């Protein structure tokens, strides 16, 4: 465990200060892109709308199980090879973990929404937010664009950073690879529409299980970061609203970080959402909070995000140091 804590500490720092390298991923496929291609292949070959729902559910389940097993196997193979490479192997493991985290890339995409609202108005904001959310941006006003960016930031703080870190600590590279596949599968086929309702059902449920603990950890970290940055009362407010409203969210997990961010920022988040021509109803989190969010609220959310990430990184580093000295 001490080694995994050290690797994760270095990976979190590398991802924070360097992040993704666009020039590299223009030349070779990012691992998540490869996962997406595998899912697309399976969906194309096994999600036939002429099949009965029970067959589609079974096809989706076996595709997901098979590809999760392949990811675990790949992780086991790489984990067995790296120790034989000495220092280069240790560096490679840090880089692999960093590649599968998303602190800087997530923050950059969300910051781009705030900047677009300032520079290009609502049309610029809609275009920028469409890069990070699946909902229909054409129906969003400035408040809707800003809330969508903040909601995506809160949810992906869990899905993109805390959860991968958690599963790496639990299962090493095999656990990390398996989680990234599950989360990617959920984002691609775990939708409640006619095309994916049956085929993606298993992937969606598996993602709910995989994110159960990380989502709640993310909310707690955000509330604690709020307390450290703005005082106990602000932290208690974030924690209280999280505990009160998280279960109102249509997702069993996304509501925890989103409600914590809503309470910390004094915003009303979630509520009805437009996906294409379909409206998905849902209650607001922190319904008495401010609804007319704007670019400066995105800025405040980014400050909270980085405070939360700093707290998590600090805890991981502290745990690794304790392990070194005690062990």
From Swiss-Prot:
One record GO biological process: cobalamin biosynthetic process
One Pfam family here: CobD_Cbib
Subcellular location: Cell membrane
Pathway linked to the protein: Cofactor biosynthesis; adenosylcobalamin biosynthesis
Topology with respect to the bilayer: Multi-pass membrane protein
Transmembrane spans: 61-78, 80-102, 160-182, 300-322
InterPro entries tied to this protein: Cobalamin_biosynth_CobD/CbiB
Alphabetical UniProt keywords: Cell membrane, Cobalamin biosynthesis, Membrane, Transmembrane, Transmembrane helix
A Gene Ontology term for the protein's cellular component: plasma membrane
MF (Gene Ontology): ABC-type vitamin B12 transporter activity; threonine-phosphate decarboxylase activity
Transport listed as a keyword: no
Homology family: Belongs to the CobD/CbiB family.
Primary role: Converts cobyric acid to cobinamide by the addition of aminopropanol on the F carboxylic group.
HAMAP family the UniProt entry points to: CobD_CbiB (MF_00024)
NCBIfam families referenced in this protein's UniProt entry, alphabetically: cobal_cbiB
Name of this protein: Cobalamin biosynthesis protein CobD
